[in-house]
């Protein structure tokens, strides 16, 4: 697939569930129980932006109770995967993520209750940068109450927060990162894959 095909391939996984776009429908499937959870017919709108061709984004929440997707320029849709009820979030911003308890959805530096779509104050112990563009970085990874957060640029330090206590546990400024790093939680730590080809593993109590 061409890099400019979409904002990001509409593919995500959380727990035993996976979300993907078939070209006509968004599907959420539970591979643990081998059952389809939710399906919706959508059409991804063509973009006028130079960075990507279509608005085509979807993600699952950490506890797999919600999904979020964007197929047009100025709104996100939150879906309750048990009731299939939808809430529309009017927001043309970038870099969406859920809170660890699935109760809050953040995008474009704003925060919303996932049940109602009502805007709320920042519930996180860290501030979220305002005005970040598509090409800026706001990457968030969640495991239990831990959140690893990187903002501004792909080479910025990664902060590890415990949302339960509100404490900043660590700031990781990996020496092998030049311009970009990808990071993810494993069962026992946080793994960084840098643009130097190095793999760094940081242990943390999960």
Predicted regions, residues:
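Short glycine/acidic-enriched loop and turn motifs that connect beta-strands
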Residues: 153-155, 197-198
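Blade-level signature of beta-propeller repeat domains, shared across WD40, Kelch, NHL, RCC1
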Residues: 178-206
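A generic tandem-repeat structural signature
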Residues: 1, 6-9, 14-24, 30-31
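Short coil/turn segments that connect the beta-strands within blades of beta-propeller domains
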Residues: 14-16, 63-65, 101-103, 144-145, ...
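Structural core positions within WD40/WD-like beta-propeller blades
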Residues: 19, 68, 106, 146-149, ...
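Surface-exposed loop/turn elements that mediate protein-protein interactions on large endomembrane-trafficking
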Residues: 1-2, 26-48, 73-90, 109-130, ...
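Repeated scaffold domains used in trafficking and secretory/extracellular systems
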Residues: 3-13, 45-60, 90-101, 126-140, ...
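Plant-skewed but cross-kingdom recognition/interaction modules and surfaces
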Residues: 26, 58-60, 70
């Amino acid at each position: 697939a061409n890099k400019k095909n979409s904002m990001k391939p509409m593919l995500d996984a959380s727990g035993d569930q996976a979300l993907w776009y078939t070209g006509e429908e968004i599907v959420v499937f539970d591979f643990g129980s081998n059952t389809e959870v939710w399906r919706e017919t959508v059409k991804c709108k063509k973009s006028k932006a130079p960075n990507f061709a279509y608005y085509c984004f979807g993600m699952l929440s950490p506890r797999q109770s919600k999904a979020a997707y964007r197929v047009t320029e100025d709104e996100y849709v939150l879906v309750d995967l048990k009731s299939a009820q939808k809430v529309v979030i009017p927001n043309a911003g970038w870099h969406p993520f859920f809170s660890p308890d699935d109760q809050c959805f953040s995008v474009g530096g704003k925060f919303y209750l996932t049940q109602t779509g009502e805007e709320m104050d920042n519930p996180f112990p860290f501030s979220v940068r305002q005005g970040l563009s598509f090409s800026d970085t706001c990457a968030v990874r969640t495991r239990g109450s831990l959140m690893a957060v990187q903002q501004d640029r792909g080479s910025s330090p990664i902060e590890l927060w415990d949302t339960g206590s509100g404490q900043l546990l660590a700031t990781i400024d990996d020496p092998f990162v030049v311009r970009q790093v990808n990071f993810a939680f494993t069962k026992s730590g946080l793994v960084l894959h840098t643009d130097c080809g190095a793999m760094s593993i940081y242990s943390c109590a999960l």
